[in-house]
């Protein structure tokens, strides 16, 4: 499961001591799951980042270079491989990449 939070400062969660943010669900995920303390993206825009996560490719390979660019025809996402292996997959939220 991936939970993506756009435009989210690295420290804007209560478990990191933010004085105003109240994030009990993220706090629970961090204490019972994984919290990456040193993570980054190669392109700080929504769509290119999503395309990289879902394809495993850098932006110059998948060509989603901004938030208005569609994913090129024939682009394969890793959930498609999971589906071929018999897994049920799902997506909730914004997409921004056409199709």
Segments and roles (model prediction):
Residues 1-99:
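Formylglycine-dependent sulfatase
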